[in-house]
């Protein structure tokens, strides 16, 4: 049996593992308090702050976001089916879909197990909502898929369009 899209599976498992381990570390080492416990890594710019979120990114749908667990499950199953039943993807596509799966599964597991997602990355410089590695991986996945959709870089496309030189001739003029 030929196992295809191996980079997809590697990316998905690695991103899921990193997301899970960082959330586990936060839960074990921080108290869930009001106001939230925070550790400034770069004061005023970047902190680790333990909060939970029952909604989606930026706390959207935090009221009645029960359906988000099923959306996470559906996206995860769909991406796995695509990797198994679909074509062999290029590296950018495999990375993109893998990061999407890792992020969707990471937040989905939180939603099924605890009913909420653990967030802890607090970028305060621009007042950004607190997020987690799963959110980062989902965004990286989207960027990878955009790169894949745009195809080769323009310089590479020009080289591919350039007509090849005729083969050298044995006859001299």
Swiss-Prot record:
NCBIfam families: lspA. Its EC number is 3.4.23.36. This protein specifically catalyzes the removal of signal peptides from prolipoproteins. It is a multi-pass membrane protein. It comes from Cyanothece sp. (strain PCC 7425 / ATCC 29141). PANTHER family: LIPOPROTEIN SIGNAL PEPTIDASE. InterPro entries: Peptidase_A8. It catalyses: Release of signal peptides from bacterial membrane prolipoproteins. Hydrolyzes -Xaa-Yaa-Zaa-|-(S,diacylglyceryl)Cys-, in which Xaa is hydrophobic (preferably Leu), and Yaa (Ala or Ser) and Zaa (Gly or Ala) have small, neutral side chains. The chain crosses the membrane at residues 7-27, 41-61, 70-90, 95-115, 130-150. This is Lipoprotein signal peptidase. Its main location: membrane. It is found in: Cell inner membrane. The gene is lspA. The lineage of its organism: Bacteria, Bacillati, Cyanobacteriota, Cyanophyceae, Gomontiellales.
